[in-house]
Amino acid sequence: MGGALIHGWAKSGRVEHIAVADKNEALLAQFKAKYPALATTTDNAEAVKGADIVVVVVKPWLMPVVLGEIKAALDLEKQIVVSDAANFTTGKLAEAFGREGQFCYVIPNIAAEYGASMSFIAKGQGASEETLSRVKALYDLVGDTLAVSENLVGPGMMMASCGIAYVMRYIRAQMQGGCEMGFYPAQAKQIALQTMQGAVSLLKETGWHPEEAIDKVTTPGGVTIKGLNELDHADFTSAVIRSLKAGLK
């Protein structure tokens, strides 16, 4: 996820404002080769010095380690700290630092690399509205950002971050069906992607509810309703809902 954000922010034209810390020197060299103006270091504490916004993007179980490394280098009166780790909320940031601060909890998705993330942001109890606006503006550079209460970041993650995998699974299934009906894999992929893009464009441009769009292409006794009924017989809608809720258990 960190790599996707770095690429996305760099492509937005802000590369000279980014400092990246990672223990993997080879990975840092790859970023530096692609974005020469990018500041890189293997020292987490060094990276946060002078930063306006510190974004910590590691696996949740590594958060205490990384926060411990940067704690002494941070000025929590001035700097904003953002957790991009699943379930590592602003409350956990406050616990790690022993105090409240300008903390935000954000969950983006891997489409950030291409400026197409759907991100969810929540501010901590001690954070100001200005902090929320500044962090939201940062993530708006890599897609759409929705400010929510912290209890909705998890559901948002299931819909938008995990949801990407679920959409990919549907695309794969459509491709498999296309191949079975006679299309080459590349053709089936082209058809599936353009169909998905067309559906998204219809909803964005018209403001329709999905059911309205379905009605536009469904005729009595037609082939579309037969396919829709097969999806219903297979509990397609229920399966999607269960998949979204599964990660919250």
For each predicted feature, which ranges?
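Glycine/serine-rich anion-binding loops at beta->alpha junctions
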Residues: 108-112, 157-167
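Rossmann-like NAD(P)(H) cofactor-binding subdomain of soluble oxidoreductases
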Residues: 5, 44-49, 53-121
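NAD(P)-dependent Rossmann-like dehydrogenase/reductase catalytic/cofactor-binding core
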Residues: 193-249
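Small-residue helix-packing motif on alpha-helices
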Residues: 28, 47, 184-191, 213
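Glycine-rich beta-alpha junction loops
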Residues: 24, 86-88, 108-112, 194-196, ...
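NAD(P)+-binding Rossmann beta1-loop-alpha1 motif at the extreme N-terminus of oxidoreductases
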Residues: 1-50, 116-117, 179-181
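Internal alpha-helical scaffold of NAD(P)-dependent oxidoreductase catalytic cores
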Residues: 92-102, 118-155, 166-205, 246
